[in-house]
Structures are given as structure tokens and as C-alpha cells.
């Protein structure tokens, strides 16, 4: 089955899944909606994020009778999709979201696309208009099946009530095996209302779908040989490591071979940030030393990655000096963006287990010496620039007191210190996302939940809710920008009503910061609708997030001065309830380093207009 494989159940050949042999007259008569909920219980579902409507209310009525499933009512379907996706990414099991037909289903689309791009197992169940009304432009009818074809792993339109048990069992299996992804199950209202004596299959048997792909012994030996011959190897790994629960195997591989490891943003946590072999992460805003190590590598071991443009930039120049080994469970990713010299389709956990039996260690002394020099010379760093000193933030909010400036990077550093790097961090999309990845030192997988491939603003706080539901024992903090936070601010109501103690730290610069940065770099600082404050009252911080939060009965406070920050963060972290901390920061700060789109590592901007002096290519 390809990554996208979609069929209406009425037109789909029956699978040959064995069925429990129970005489029909002995099986209880059940309504379709009750069968759906029973199937979810059978799959071990503990939480459903759902917003009811006319075409899905039968399912919600059935949920009220479930003793095993907690139903969380969000305040927008996009919020529920992000929450369910984050729940899945934190606990590793499929998240479930539920919406009605029409606008309810379309509001899920961004979350479904996000799960598809970032390979998260998501089950999106939608109500649909009754079967006789399909295709007749009925009230709240949309073709969610067709609409989501490019952004799902599989889709079902359930036209027969008897198919529900098989469909749901298949959906969970498909979503969580191979490369994880979202599955849509569209169920017409009259199917939910129909009755049958259901048969629950005891296992899934999908002909043509074989997610259990394994590396060959020949490939293992070839990779071991390449490592033996290499002088400058680098492991480049991504979210595939985390999805496969292969972080322990990756660390063992790195320590056995003594090969440095660079991750993508989606792979952050696959190896501890403070591990001696960690290069942190690479790409547009990644470390100088990770980017340059990949550029200089004579062997690139690409594990569970897709060579996306935010990592490779000018792809023809990416890792052009080295032999590329690409291992991924999804064959469609092999040679899609970058041709590999040794392509391998395999489950990465199994591949690493086999490699760990075959590889031998080397010292790579010269290589590690070079990397140590780059690390010492080019750490993540920031300073108070002239632009910050001249900013409205300093002039008006601080009355010129430069000792009280709050740099956004410092907020993340302090949060890392106070939580000892052990919090689950979710983000929206923008500058704050990059600073969170740069300055929070993640030690474990499934601790950074961000929107990577799709880059969806509004992701941060709903994701924090889903993460906190999945791990109520952990401190969960949504780091957001004022633009991104506003997009799903209504989920503060969900946090309060459902008693979900997820925190929010807003790096509030009154602008769309990342777009402003690009305006400064590439558009002569011409502002194209990136100011989020009140133009008629620029001296006011707008909106008043503290007042808004308190309107939802959520605790909140604003921080303007550096001396206020530590005690405010301590109060937030000590609170056993939802909490919003609105931190005012200057908008003139840029995320650095930065490789401009389509450029190379040699055109990386490090500080203001400084580019790295990384030497020539002698010895390559």
C-alpha cells in the first residue's frame, strides 16, 4: 500500500481477516455509532478529542455511555486535531479526533496535513450526511474523503454498518505501522444509526500492505565496510528515529562507531543535546558545526530523514563530497530529493540493531578535533544589538534601562535551567520555534512537539493540551509567539474546563517576527502587514493576553523587565493549573545562524552579516 491509498469501503474488496466464530443469533444487535465506540475501546483508546455537530452527534451520544474513553471538548476542530496529533507523538499511540461533516471536517484539514507531513499516527473520524444525500449538496456536505486524498495515509468512506469493525481495526493498524500517518474514516449519519450484529475480526490481513521492511545482511555488511573506510563520517537522522522508538539503538550505534550525530528539528531528542557526539541539529537555523560537518563529510549516514529543503537548502550542494547511505521505511522517500549511493528500505530500528552487531569503532581523531574547533568557535550565541538598544521596547517599555532587556533566547535558556531540560515543549511556528530548538537542551525523544513539515501557526497551545493529557506527570509548556498563540487562543477554555495544566510562554514582540526577519534580510525592511499591534495606539501592548486569559479563568501575568522573569517563570512552573506568561521582547532580534533559502553553508549568516570562515576544501 503506498503512503496515500484511498478507497470507499463500498467499492473495496473484502479482506480475508479471520472472524470470531459466534453464531449470529448470539451476537448482540448494536447501532453503528455504538459499534464505532466499542471498536475504539477494543483498540485501547483512552481519549477522544471531539466537537459535536449534526452528522456526528450519534457518535457523541455513544461516547457518553463509554466507561473507558474520556472525551475532551475543544473549542475549534483545528485545536482538536493538533491536540490529538500531539497526544500521539508524545505517547506513540494513535490520537483520535472527531468532527461533524462540512465545516467541522474542513476545520480538521490543517491538523491532518500536519500529521501527514510529520508522520504522526492520527485517526480522524468525521460524520457525513446520510447516504441518499451524498453528492446532492446537502446541508453541511463536503467531500472530506476526496478533499484529504493527498494528505492521508489512507481514507475510508463507510457505506455499510457491517464494515465498521474491520475498517477501524485496519485504520489503527495502517496509521501506526510502517511510516506512521493519518487515516480518515468518514461515516454517514444513517450508517451510524443503522443496526447489525457486528463481527469483530481477531487480526488484520491487508493484502499488498507490508510495513515490516528489513535491511539485508548484504546491505549491513556494505555499510559497515563504508564506515571502516571513512575518515569523516556523520550520522544525519530525523523524525523516523523517534517514530520507530529507535533512539537507544541510535545512541548505541554512535557510541560504538564514534560517529558524530546531527539531527533534524523533527529528530531533536533522538540523542541528548549534551552528548559528546551530538552536533545538535542542522539546517537553515541549525548549528554551524552540524551544517559544516555534513558539508565536509566523506560518508553521510541518513537515517529516517527525507532531505527536505529546510535542511538541504541548495540540494545539489548538500553533502556533495560524501557517499550517501539512506535508510528509510518509506520507499517513496528514497532518491526523491537527493540521490543515495546506497539506498535501503527498512525499519530503522531493525536496521540499527543489525548494524550494531556488525560495526566496529574507529577514533576519527582528526575529524573530532576539527569538529571540536567548530563547536568552540561557533556555538549558538546572541547579544544585545544596536537595533535592540534603539527599539521601542527599550525606549518606552523599559524607559531606557538596558539592564532590564529580555532577549527571547534568554527566556528559553532560563526555562531550560529551571526545568532541568525535562519538560515537554510544544511550539507554534516562527522565530520562537527556532529559539526553542536552539536554546532548550532536549535530553530525550518525544519532548519537542512542533510543526515541522507543514509549519502551521496555531499549533503550539493545542499541542500542549494534547501532550499534557498524554503525559500528566510531565511539565508541559507551549512556547509561542503572539501571532501564533492568537490563532488558537480559544483553547484556553479547553484547558480550564478540562483541567489540563498546560502552560504557555508567549514571546510577544507585537510582530510576525520571522516574516519581519525576512523583510529585513531580503525586502529592505519594508513592512508588509507584519505589525500585530494597534496602529492607532502603538504605545499599548495589544492584545492584552493577561486580560484575555483571565476571561477564560486561566491564570496569567505579563513580564516586561528581566528582573521579573525568573520569579514569574517559577510561579508558572509551580502552578498546578493552566497558566499564561506574556513575555515582552524586542521585535528587532533575528534568529541566527541562518542559511538563506536556496543558498549553501558557505553563505550562512552567523551574526549580523558575518559568515563563517570555515576554510577551504583541502583534504577532501
Tell me the role of every PLM-derived stretch.
Residues 10-27, 162, 198, 321, ...:
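Phosphate/pyrophosphate-binding active-site segments
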Residues 89, 241-325, 433, 441-473, ...:
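Glycine-rich, anion-gripping cofactor-binding loops and their flanking helix/strand elements
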Residues 142, 170, 174-229, 368, ...:
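Conformationally flexible catalytic loops at phosphate/diphosphate-handling active centers
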Residues 33-37, 41, 45, 59, ...:
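Active-site diphosphate/adenylate-binding microenvironment
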Residues 35-45, 86-92, 116, 174-179, ...:
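Glycine-rich phosphate/diphosphate-binding loops that line cofactor/substrate pockets in enzymes
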Residues 4, 126-167, 189, 267-377, ...:
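Glycine-rich, acidic loop regions that bind phosphate or pyrophosphate groups
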Residues 57-131, 133-140, 289-308, 335-337, 343-345, 434-513, ...:
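Thiamine diphosphate
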Amino acid at each position: 500500500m503506498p503512503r496515500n491509498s484511498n478507497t470507499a469501503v463500498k467499492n473495496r474488496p473484502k479482506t480475508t481477516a479471520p472472524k470470531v466464530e459466534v453464531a449470529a443469533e448470539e451476537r448482540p444487535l448494536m447501532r453503528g455509532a455504538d459499534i464505532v465506540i466499542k471498536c475504539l475501546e477494543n483498540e485501547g483508546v483512552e481519549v477522544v478529542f471531539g466537537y459535536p455537530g449534526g452528522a456526528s452527534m450519534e457518535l457523541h451520544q455513544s461516547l457518553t455511555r463509554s466507561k473507558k474513553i474520556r472525551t475532551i471538548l475543544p473549542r475549534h476542530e483545528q485545536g482538536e486535531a493538533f491536540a490529538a496529533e500531539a497526544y500521539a507523538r508524545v505517547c506513540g499511540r494513535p490520537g483520535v479526533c472527531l468532527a461533524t461533516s462540512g465545516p467541522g471536517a474542513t476545520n480538521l484539514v490543517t491538523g491532518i496535513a500536519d500529521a501527514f507531513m510529520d508522520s504522526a499516527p492520527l485517526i480522524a473520524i468525521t460524520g457525513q450526511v446520510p447516504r441518499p444525500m451524498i453528492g446532492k449538496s446537502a446541508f453541511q456536505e463536503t467531500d472530506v474523503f476526496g478533499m484529504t486524498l493527498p494528505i492521508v495515509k489512507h481514507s475510508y468512506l463507510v457505506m455499510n454498518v457491517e464494515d465498521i469493525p474491520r475498517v477501524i481495526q485496519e485504520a489503527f493498524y495502517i496509521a501506526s505501522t510502517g511510516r506512521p500517518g493519518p487515516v480518515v474514516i468518514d461515516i454517514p449519519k444513517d450508517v451510524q444509526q443503522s443496526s447489525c450484529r457486528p463481527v469483530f475480526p481477531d487480526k488484520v490481513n491487508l493484502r499488498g500492505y507490508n510495513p515490516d521492511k528489513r535491511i539485508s545482511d548484504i546491505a549491513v555488511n556494505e555499510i559497515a565496510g563504508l564506515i571502516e573506510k571513512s575518515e569523516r563520517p556523520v550520522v544525519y537522522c530525523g523524525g523516523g528515529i523517534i517514530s520507530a522508538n529507535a533512539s537507544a539503538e541510535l545512541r548505541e550505534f554512535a557510541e560504538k562507531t564514534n560517529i558524530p550525530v546531527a539531527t533534524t528539528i523533527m529528530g531533536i531528542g533522538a540523542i541528548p543535546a549534551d552528548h559528546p557526539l551530538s552536533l545538535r541539529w542542522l539546517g537553515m537555523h541549525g548549528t554551524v558545526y552540524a551544517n559544516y560537518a555534513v558539508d565536509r563529510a566523506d560518508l553521510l549516514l541518513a537515517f529516517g530523514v527525507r532531505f527536505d529543503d529546510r535542511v538541504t537548502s541548495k540540494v545539489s550542494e548538500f553533502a556533495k563530497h560524501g557517499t550517501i547511505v539512506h535508510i528509510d521505511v518509506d520507499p517513496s522517500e528514497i532518491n526523491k530529493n537527493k540521490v543515495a549511493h546506497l539506498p535501503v528500505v527498512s525499519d530503522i530500528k531493525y536496521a540499527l540493531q543489525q548494524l550494531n552487531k556488525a560495526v566496529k569503532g574507529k577514533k576519527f581523531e582528526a575529524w573530532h578535533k576539527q569538529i571540536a574547533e567548530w563547536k568552540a568557535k561557533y556555538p549558538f550565541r546572541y547579544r544585545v544589538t544596536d537595533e535592540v538598544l534603539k527599539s521601542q521596547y527599550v525606549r518606552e517599555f523599559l524607559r531606557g534601562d538596558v539592564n532590564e532587556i529580555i532577549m527571547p533566547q534568554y527566556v528559553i535558556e532560563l526555562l531550560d535551567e529551571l526545568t532541568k531540560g525535562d519538560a515537554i515543549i510544544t511550539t507554534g511556528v516562527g522565530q520562537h520555534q527556532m529559539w526553542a530548538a536552539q536554546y532548550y537542551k532536549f535530553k530525550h525523544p518525544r519532548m519537542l512537539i512542533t510543526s515541522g513539515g507543514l509549519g502551521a501557526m496555531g499549533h503550539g497551545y493545542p499541542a500542549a493540551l494534547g501532550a499534557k493529557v498524554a503525559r500528566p506527570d510531565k511539565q508541559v509548556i507551549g512556547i509561542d509567539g503572539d501571532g501564533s498563540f492568537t490563532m488558537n487562543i480559544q483553547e484556553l477554555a479547553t484547558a480550564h474546563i478540562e483541567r489540563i495544566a498546560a502552560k504557555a510562554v508567549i514571546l510577544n514582540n507585537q510582530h510576525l517576527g520571522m516574516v519581519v526577519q525576512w523583510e529585513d534580510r531580503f525586502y529592505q525592511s519594508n513592512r508588509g502587514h507584519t505589525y500585530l499591534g494597534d496602529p492607532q495606539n502603538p504605545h499599548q501592548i495589544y492584545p492584552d493576553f493577561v486580560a484575555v486569559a483571565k476571561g477564560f479563568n486561566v491564570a496569567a501575568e505579563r513580564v516586561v523587565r528581566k528582573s521579573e522573569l525568573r520569579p514569574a517563570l517559577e510561579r508558572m512552573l509551580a502552578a498546578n493549573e493552566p497558566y499564561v506568561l506574556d513575555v515582552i521582547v524586542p521585535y528587532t532580534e533575528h534568529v541566527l545562524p541562518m542559511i538563506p533559502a536556496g543558498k549553501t553553508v558557505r553563505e550562512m549568516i552567523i551574526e549580523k552579516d558575518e559568515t563563517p570562515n570555515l576554510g577551504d576544501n583541502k583534504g577532501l
